[in-house]
Structure formats: structure tokens, C-alpha cells
Amino acid sequence: MKLCGLDFETANSCNGSICSVGVAVVENGEVLERKEYLIKPHKSLDWMSKFCRDIHGITYEDLRESPEFSKVWQSVKTMLTSADCVAIHNAPFDLRHLHNILSLYHLPSVSFDYVCSLQLCRHHFPEAHSHSLNCMADMFGMTFQHHDALEDAETCAKIASQLEIPENFICRFEYLQNA
């Protein structure tokens, strides 16, 4: 199964305040394609909280010359929709941000199948003391830089590619553009 890992880092607590996106396509454990973009947040959400900055290390200055999400969306969308399924660790968080940013920019409708790798890990490893991405990566012997969008996306896809994904764990994300 071809999986596409997706991860966002955010500038603040507002839904849609994406400041970094990582996307990695993995098939049979091999990375086929990977991309990361620093994103200048939408003008209505254009501020960086200390809390978020301390988590991912991205500063407002890092984003000053970065494109807005609408400029990179086509590339991200192509990768997402080329995969059989998108793997997202704690999918509700990232999908809430994706839905809001698509709406803010009035971007065209999109849909894709996805699996929440957090739920998948809870299913396969109920005894684990934590199901966070870094703990699961340790369990699989993977090293990565946590809270780096590209590293998180790639690690998520690699973990999901090594696990059986029950049919009922696959969900559908649908964003319908408002007319």
C-alpha cells in the first residue's frame, strides 16, 4: 500500500495557523517522495505564540519570506491524492487545521482516505506506556527530529506501513468548497 504521511506545525492555537507542512510518500517501507514547506500563516492568523515556537523552533522571522499555504497546496494535494491512504498521527488535529486553511483560502474541494496512526498504534500496542509518535518511533527503532513536519510525516508513514491497517480504521476526509 502506498501511504502518504502528513504533518503540520502551527504558529498558534488558532485552527488553520499552519506554519510548516511535511509530506512523505512511502511504499513498502521506502520513501518515494518527500517535501517540506515553511508557510507564512494566513493574514488573519499571522502571529507566532511562544508556546508553539518552543515546541517546533520555528520563528516568525523564519516565515517572513515563505509562501502562503495557497501557493504550495497544489503540490501537497498531488502527493496526498496519489497515495492509497494518508497516515496522520493524531489526525483530528491536523485535519481540523487543513479544513480551516482550505476554507480561509477558498481552495477547491478535495477528498482522500486517511488513517490516524495514533489510533492504529493504540490498536496494535494497547500495552505501550505511550502512543506518541516519538515513543512509537523508539519502539520501531527509528530516530527522527520530533516536531519537524517532514520528519514527523515520514516517520508516521513508515510506522503505518509496517502495521496491518484494518478496513474500519480507514476514514475519508472531504472538504467541499463553499459556492
Which residue stretches match the model-derived regions?
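Acidic, Mg2+-coordinating catalytic module of metal-dependent nucleases/exonucleases
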Residues: A83-L102, H131-A179
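Ser/Thr-centric signal marking residues that sit
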Residues: F8-T10, S117, C156
